[in-house]
């Protein structure tokens, strides 16, 4: 889990799980077979994911307030837009992914790129993050940050965030913004 904690939020190019597995086992494996099986299982699991509690309500409230919404992800554009499309989340005015920048999280470049795209000063923006690397990127960009851990990151130190919630459904957008003011 310690290895994954360091990797989460950085993007797939930072860590090779196959090499980690070979190192732990002490012998080589059929790389293509392992990667093919892993990819198939990953796709099955992803297809079952639903929108997290509170996300739709928060997006709707943000739109009602006239707030601009963006996505900053260390994942590939194909992966991100595929999930946004599948989940019916089309309300983001800007989506930036690892394909769009030289440096991914914990570097602030993704967040700075989204803020520039939205014409929002980083100090006026709020990042919702589930990883320590994402929180570090948001804070380095000069943003306020809310940690909302997922099952993989719930046990990690996310204390660098300005606020931690178990779920986005815990607070209305108005309450969240008030706590960050």
Positions of predicted regions on the chain:
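N-terminal helical cap/lid subdomain that shapes the substrate entry/recognition surface
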Residues: 1-65, 78
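Asp-based, Mg2+/Mn2+-dependent phosphohydrolase catalytic module
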Residues: 60-63, 67, 76-181
């Amino acid at each position: 889990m310690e290895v994954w904690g360091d990797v989460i939020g950085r993007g797939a190019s930072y860590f090779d799980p196959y090499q980690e597995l070979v190192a732990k086992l002490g012998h080589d494996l059929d790389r293509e077979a392992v990667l093919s099986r892993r990819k198939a299982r990953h796709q099955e699991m992803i297809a079952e994911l639903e929108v997290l509690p509170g996300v739709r309500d928060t997006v709707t409230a943000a739109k009602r307030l006239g707030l601009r919404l963006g996505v900053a992800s260390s994942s590939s554009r194909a992966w991100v837009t595929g999930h946004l499309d599948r989940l019916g989340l089309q309300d983001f005015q800007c989506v930036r992914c690892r394909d769009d920048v030289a440096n991914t999280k914990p570097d602030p470049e993704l967040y700075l790129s989204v803020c520039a795209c939205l014409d929002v000063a980083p100090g006026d923006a709020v990042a919702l993050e589930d990883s320590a690397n994402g929180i570090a990127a948001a804070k380095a960009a000069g943003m306020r940050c809310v940690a909302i851990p997922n099952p993989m990151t719930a046990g990690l130190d996310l204390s660098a965030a300005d606020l931690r919630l178990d779920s986005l459904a815990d607070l209305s957008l108005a309450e969240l913004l008030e706590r960050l003011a």
